[in-house]
């Protein structure tokens, strides 16, 4: 490697590059050095992808996931899985060599137990993608509620700037406003949504439709209500919000500075008796109790055992797709085994599992996949 120290003039730098290229050098391609390391066997494909993830990480959580991956956590897990699958395949294929003698080298009970364990491990990795994806790209948080309840004021308070327009006129927010905030090393993507209500205004109606769409995509829903509203009215709003599987919802009683402590306490008690969800009182305008809100958000993510215990968490969409396919092939092998299919068909399903796992670490890959992966790298990596 040659390092050139020169004056900082752009012209001088360009001239040095021109002379180097004239003498036979060429510009490095994106990801070329990492690709060379992969092709030389210094790292597997999942580790190479982790290099790009480390460069692109914009939070401590995203960096932690990428660091675990580049240190070989994936490699060890998938090498172990592939070794077990290869053992199964070799026993099944050995039966084919002695097919005329009707001999079973692979005990079917043991085979079923091993496939069950392998399917569970692959499924657990695949299921971890939901957490890994939101940690890598930011946890989507939808702030929803009626018009003028203080959603935009809350976003401005969290950002410490006037990002969203605040007005006493209902329906001011018609389009979605999205901003990212880092809370203790985790990136949260806050979406300030249009107030939900019946309206004849077509533009406002479009904004409400977008709101409901983003609510379905959010990992966390913050339903903001007026702390002065009766608990029955708040309960009705809560029941109107669609909460999908895996989503979390918290009830935020805003404008607590205009309600008595007794009133807030009674509302909290009534609402928590009917709903097993967090209920928090804040004052977005006065920035009261916002620390409790940010702590609630952080804890909702960090409470996941796999994040705290250092378990493998999948954050790459390509890996998740391969794991889903591997899980499907493993399930087919299990069903085939239970149905008494022949060893050659069983071996074919297991080879398919091996293929999908091999695409993650690079044992099996194509030039198109490599081009797609390394084209995302910056020059010099």
Language-model segment annotations:
Residues 60-182, 199-201, 213, 217, ...:
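C-terminal-of-GTPase-core extension/linker across diverse P-loop GTPases
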Residues 26, 187-189, 278:
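Conserved beta-strand segments of alpha/beta enzyme cores
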Residues 205:
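Cytosolic ligand/metal-binding cores
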Residues 223:
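Redox-cofactor binding/interface segments in oxidoreductases and associated redox assembly factors
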Residues 1-47, 58:
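N-terminal accessory targeting/assembly segments
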Residues 186-202:
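Conserved nucleotide-sensing/catalytic segment adjacent to the nucleotide-binding pocket
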């Amino acid at each position: 490697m040659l390092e050139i120290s020169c004056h900082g003039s752009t012209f001088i730098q360009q001239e040095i590059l021109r002379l180097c290229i004239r003498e036979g050098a060429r510009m490095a391609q994106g990801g070329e050095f990492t690709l060379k390391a992969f092709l030389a066997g210094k790292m597997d494909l999942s580790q190479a992808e982790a290099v790009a993830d480390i460069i692109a990480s914009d939070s401590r959580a995203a960096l932690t996931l990428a660091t675990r991956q580049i240190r070989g956590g994936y490699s060890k897990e998938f090498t172990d899985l592939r070794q077990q699958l290869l053992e199964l395949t070799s026993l099944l294929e050995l039966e084919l060599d002695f097919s005329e003698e009707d001999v079973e080298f692979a005990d079917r009970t043991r085979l079923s137990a091993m496939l069950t364990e392998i399917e569970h491990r692959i499924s657990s990795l695949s299921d971890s993608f939901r957490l890994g994806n939101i940690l890598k790209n930011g946890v989507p948080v939808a702030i929803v509620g009626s018009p003028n309840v203080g959603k935009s004021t809350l976003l401005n308070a969290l950002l410490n700037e006037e990002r969203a327009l605040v007005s006493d006129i209902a329906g001011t927010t018609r389009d979605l406003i999205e901003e990212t905030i880092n809370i203790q090393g985790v990136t949260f993507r806050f979406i300030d949504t249009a107030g939900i209500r019946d309206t004849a205004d077509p533009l406002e109606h479009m904004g409400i439709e977008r709101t409901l769409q983003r609510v379905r995509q959010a990992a966390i829903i913050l339903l903001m209500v007026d702390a002065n509203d009766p608990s029955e009215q708040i309960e009705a709003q809560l029941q109107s919000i669609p909460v999908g599987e895996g989503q979390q919802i918290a009830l935020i009683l805003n404008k607590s500075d205009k309600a008595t402590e007794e009133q807030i306490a009674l509302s909290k008690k009534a609402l928590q008796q009917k709903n097993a969800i967090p209920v928090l009182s804040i004052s977005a305008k006065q920035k009261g109790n916002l620390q409790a809100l940010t702590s609630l958000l952080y804890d909702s993510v960090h409470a996941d055992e796999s994040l705290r215990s250092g378990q493998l968490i999948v954050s790459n969409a390509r890996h998740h797709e391969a794991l889903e396919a591997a899980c499907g092939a493993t399930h087919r092998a299990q069903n085939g085994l239970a149905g008494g299919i022949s060893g050659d068909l069983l071996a074919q399903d297991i080879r398919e599992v091996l293929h999908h796992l091999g695409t993650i670490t690079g044992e099996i890959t194509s030039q198109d996949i490599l081009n797609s992966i390394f084209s995302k790298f910056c020059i010099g990596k």
